[in-house]
Amino acid sequence: MKEPIEFKLSGDRAFSEREKAINQLYNRRYFGEVVNGKLFLSLIEAAYLMERGKIKVLDGGKELSFEELFELGRKKDDQFDIKYLVYKDLRDRGYIVKSALKFGSHFRVYRRGMDEHSQWLIWVVPENLRFSANDITARVRVAHGVRKNMVMAVVDEDNDVVYYKIEWVKF
């Protein structure tokens, strides 16, 4: 088994300056974002890669366990659990998953590479969430404006994910 790539915790992200990290994780598999020669991962990306034994994350020199990293994610985001489930499901299906905060959603999703524009915006919601029609309308309007499909990822109490595509219908 290959040695996990070392990352360091920095706020709500983990980073590595190692060229191996950039080549293996960003250039080949589209994880994270490269800024000034460093590969930055969100906590969700870091947890996903850590769970698979691809990386290890250090906080002040101490190696974190998967559970410790996950707990940090929970402290920073009360929906970390369900977002992670959706992220993991999409990545395991072979999709490329990136943040979509600037689009008012949780994730943007690419088919199998990032040569083209992303096709979907994913809004992650727990099964019992109450929301208004305006919540949906606003998200669909943004998705339509940037030529993407709006998908609601509903996570039930058994941690199963069901995807619903939401679109405008013109009569």
UniProtKB/Swiss-Prot annotation:
The active site is at 110, 117, 148. GO terms for molecular function: lyase activity; nucleic acid binding; tRNA-intron endonuclease activity. One of its GO terms (cellular component) is cytoplasm. Gene3D superfamilies: 3.40.1350.10, tRNA intron endonuclease, N-terminal domain. SUPFAM superfamilies: tRNA-intron endonuclease catalytic domain-like (SSF53032), tRNA-intron endonuclease N-terminal domain-like (SSF55267). InterPro entries: tRNA_endonuc-like_dom_sf, tRNA_intron_Endo_cat-like_sf, tRNA_intron_Endonuc_cat-like, tRNA_intron_Endonuc_N, tRNA_intron_Endonuc_N_sf, tRNA_splic, tRNA_splic_arch_short. Keywords: Lyase, tRNA processing. GO terms for biological process: tRNA splicing, via endonucleolytic cleavage and ligation. It comes from the Archaea. The keyword Lyase applies. Its EC number is 4.6.1.16. It catalyses: pretRNA = a 3'-half-tRNA molecule with a 5'-OH end + a 5'-half-tRNA molecule with a 2',3'-cyclic phosphate end + an intron with a 2',3'-cyclic phosphate and a 5'-hydroxyl terminus. Homotetramer; although the tetramer contains four active sites, only two participate in the cleavage. Therefore, it should be considered as a dimer of dimers. Belongs to the tRNA-intron endonuclease family. Archaeal short subfamily. PANTHER family: TRNA-SPLICING ENDONUCLEASE SUBUNIT SEN2. Endonuclease that removes tRNA introns. Cleaves pre-tRNA at the 5'- and 3'-splice sites to release the intron. The products are an intron and two tRNA half-molecules bearing 2',3' cyclic phosphate and 5'-OH termini. Recognizes a pseudosymmetric substrate in which 2 bulged loops of 3 bases are separated by a stem of 4 bp. This is tRNA-splicing endonuclease. It comes from Thermococcus onnurineus (strain NA1). The lineage of its organism: Archaea, Methanobacteriati, Methanobacteriota, Thermococci, Thermococcales.
